[in-house]
Design a protein with these regions (language model features):
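Hydrophobic alpha-helical segments at protein termini of multi-pass membrane proteins
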Residues: 1-282
């Protein structure tokens, strides 16, 4: 099959996106640490915990349960049961990041960051967690898209799709959809992606504030399961969209992310962080 060529305007947007999603998170991290005189290691811990709990632990286990063929495994009864039930499928896709990522925060604040009681620690962790997610999920994705676009223009993309289809037949259609998406990529698509990441980082920062105070004050430990619940619900909405249970426009889906991200961030910021001014232990 011959794919539509990727134009110069699309390539320019992809390159701009790759730079934006890799450089800006680093700038935010540096500005925050300098302005607040925070230890950069708190940000690094947030980034490291995202890599450990989300990428190394969560994703492989989720794939083994729901998408075994992506792991080179044979299909199994549990995967068939889950994939035949869209609502359950969406719930599991939301529950895994909710449990693993919020538990990652808990472990970090209870161990390597246990002696850092200043209120900025929660935000520093969130910047690290959210920032590395932007770099790895968007920055690297845009770099990959640039490579795919070059393959499409050189006529070698079809060979890659054939190789993917041989190992995971259900992913073949995604390859064709991606090629069409790249050919039609617009500035509006990038704006939506930027907005989604902004609100996602706000969510991660707010959730980090919640779990930080859950660890610092035993009476507020309920904030930890609350963070899991909020994370699960937000990601499950995206899962319901992917499963076809609901049909939201891209803009409406971003509105959902915006509502969750804003509510969690501003709730944590004003109800916990701001009220703690001058009270934190040094």
């Amino acid at each position: 099959m011959e794919f539509a060529k990727i134009g110069n305007s699309q390539m320019g947007l992809l390159v701009s996106g790759a730079v934006l999603f890799t450089v800006v998170p680093l700038i935010i991290a540096i500005v925050w640490t300098v302005k607040k005189k925070e230890k950069f290691t708190s940000i690094l811990v947030g980034a490291a915990c995202f890599i450990l709990f989300a990428l190394i632990l969560e994703k492989p286990l989720q794939n083994i349960l729901v998408f075994p063929t992506l792991m080179g495994l044979g299909d199994h009864a549990a995967a068939g049961f889950i994939n035949a039930r869209p609502v359950l499928w969406a719930l599991i896709l939301g529950l895994f990041p909710g449990v693993f990522e919020e538990t990652g925060r808990l472990v970090a604040f209870k161990t390597v960051l246990r002696n850092r009681k200043n209120r900025e620690t929660g935000i520093s962790y969130g910047i690290g967690h959210g920032g590395i997610e932007v770099i790895l999920t968007m920055g690297i994705t845009y770099i990959t898209y640039i490579a795919y676009a070059a393959m499409i223009n050189s006529g070698t993309f079809g060979n890659m799709i054939a190789q993917v289809a041989a190992q995971a037949p259900e992913q073949e259609a995604n390859g064709y959809a991606l090629a069409a998406q790249l050919a039609a990529f617009s500035a509006g698509d990038m704006v939506i992606g930027v907005a989604e990441r902004i609100f996602a980082v706000m969510f991660h920062t707010g959730a980090s504030i919640l779990v930080f105070y859950a660890c610092r004050d035993k009476k507020k430990f309920w904030l930890y399961p609350l963070a899991i619940l909020l994370h699960t619900v937000m990601d499950s909405v995206a899962g319901l969209q992917m499963a076809g249970v609901i049909a939201l426009s891209p803009v409406m889906l971003e509105v959902v992310v915006a509502v969750f991200g804003s509510a969690v961030f501003f709730g944590g910021y004003f109800l916990l962080y701001k009220k703690d001014a001058g009270k934190e232990q040094v």
